Design a protein with these regions (language model features):
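Membrane-interface coil-to-helix junctions
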Residues: 11-102, 109, 121-145
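Membrane-helix interface segments
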Residues: 111-117
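N-terminal membrane topogenic signal
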Residues: 1-6
Length: 145
């Protein structure tokens, strides 16, 4: 019962906190907008040639392209989470997964499932996460989660 209740609560909190997202509004994440510009020549080259470029001029006057975007053949976590996050999309999914990840970690440490809900909520709703979601540091959130 606790797992279903915890996941449902995390889902409801995420949906409630980012309610404007579900009305069609978009959070203008600055770093995501910058990434799209830096990534455009990489995507264009990948589409035209079918290969990943080794260099890009789209950031800092030129740098290795793998630092911005690279297509690895097997990205199990990204593919698994990607399917789930399509239900809510970013930013609500980032908040949801941060709470779920903390709750699962607490369970592994032997914390009572009901008790673990409170610190998981606190972790997901911490100021730091909400600030970096707004800034568009999505990969940083995935790394922390």
């Amino acid at each position: 019962m606790a797992p279903a209740a915890a996941l449902l609560l995390f889902l409801v909190v995420s949906i409630f906190y980012f309610a404007p997202q579900f009305r069609g509004e978009v959070l203008p994440q600055h770093d995501v907008l910058q990434y799209r510009g830096m990534n455009s020549d990489i995507e264009r080259t990948r589409t035209q040639t079918g290969e990943d470029p080794q260099w890009t001029g789209g950031m800092f006057g030129g740098m290795p392209a793998y630092l911005i975007n690279v297509a690895y053949p097997a990205q199990l976590v990204k593919q698994s989470v990607g399917r789930i996050s399509k239900i809510m999309d970013i930013p609500a999914s980032l908040l949801f997964f941060s709470m779920v990840a903390m709750w699962l970690m607490l369970l592994m440490f032997g914390v009572n499932p009901w008790v673990g809900i409170v610190p998981a909520l606190a972790y997901g709703l911490s100021t730091y996460f909400l600030l970096i979601i707004g800034a568009g540091h999505n990969t940083k959130i995935w790394a922390v989660v």
